[in-house]
């Protein structure tokens, strides 16, 4: 299948207005001085909420209190799958935060690393780019409630090129960071490069 290597962005007046409003609020918040300990506490609480909410979207049954307890628990204890999922997400947020401090470039390897962190504890088959389906079958995204096929993503053979296209866009575009975040999320869930963890990986990478 021939892949078209083009990412186009059309901004409406409404989108531009919203971006301007967000920039104004961000500037106001950035001018507020607070002790480092307060900043760190707010940052950690924000990452906890993200870890809970992102996994909740995927059907994780933990309450926010349970998710926070799992994150704060001794890392050497045994965790149930739902607990491991929120811990994995929190760890991935921390790793990406450190990469951002080092100004590491957005890359395909980074996407793969994040998905591996998201799927830590899962079967090896779920880690890494998805491969070919059995003859006569197509990989599809199914509705978790009805079981009906909702979307058929690109063929596995096209995934590397599509990811490279996304990486090139992120590293060369002059678009506003909010637009880049939206494109990263949209492209990753559309490409659906993995057997599992696509949504969580997309949300993590969109914040980088």
Language-model-detected regions and their locations in the chain:
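FIC/Doc superfamily catalytic core
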Residues: 1-208
């Amino acid at each position: 299948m021939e892949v078209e290597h083009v990412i186009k962005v059309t901004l409406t007046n409404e989108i531009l207005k919203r971006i301007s409003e967000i920039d104004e609020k961000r500037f106001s918040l950035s001018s507020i001085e607070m002790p480092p300990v307060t900043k760190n506490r707010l940052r950690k609480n924000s990452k906890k909420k993200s870890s809970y909410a992102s996994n909740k979207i995927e059907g994780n049954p933990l309450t926010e209190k349970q998710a926070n307890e799992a994150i704060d628990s001794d890392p050497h204890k045994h965790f149930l799958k739902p607990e491991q999922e929120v811990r994995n997400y929190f760890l991935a947020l921390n790793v990406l935060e450190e990469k951002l401090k080092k100004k590491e470039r957005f890359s395909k390897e980074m996407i793969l690393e994040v998905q591996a962190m998201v799927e830590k504890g899962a079967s090896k088959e779920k880690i890494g780019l998805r491969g070919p389906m059995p003859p006569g079958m197509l990989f599809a995204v199914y509705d978790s409630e009805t079981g009906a096929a909702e979307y058929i993503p690109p063929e596995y053979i096209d995934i590397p090129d599509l990811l490279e296209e996304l990486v090139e866009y992120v590293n060369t575009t002059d678009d506003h960071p909010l637009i880049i975040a939206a494109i990263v999320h949209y492209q990753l869930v559309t490409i659906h490069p993995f057997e599992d963890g696509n949504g969580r990986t997309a949300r993590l990478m969109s914040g980088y």
